[in-house]
């Protein structure tokens, strides 16, 4: 299991119980030496999920890995009964990848955290 191997920073260790319980799925594209090149995850609830954490190492970009990870996440979620799948993005280049995979804009969202109040 890849998640068992990725424990250096403690991130996977802290979510391992969630993964093992089937509440979160992480999919990764690995280099032959086991290095994660691209990853993504989803955490379904009541037939709905957001795809998140989709990213590719800079040295592994332009190989279709983000698209492959996204497609694998969608297929995995659909196979498990998830009917509504959404995601958010911040860059137009990423939006084009998602559009090619069948995602369409639904609305705009602005999320701001830890910002000082403006007068």
Language model features by range: what are they?
Residues 1, 88, 104-118:
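Conserved catalytic-core motifs of GNAT/GCN5-like acyltransferases
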Residues 1-27:
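Internal catalytic-core helix/loop-beta-alpha segment
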Residues 17-59:
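A conserved beta-strand-loop-helix scaffold within acyl/acetyltransferase catalytic domains
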Residues 56-58, 62-79, 100:
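Conserved acetyl-CoA-binding loop-helix of GNAT-fold acetyltransferases
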Residues 66, 70, 91-94, 113-116:
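Short glycine/proline-centered loop/turn elements that form peptide/ligand docking sites
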Residues 77-90:
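Conserved GNAT acetyl-CoA-binding A-motif
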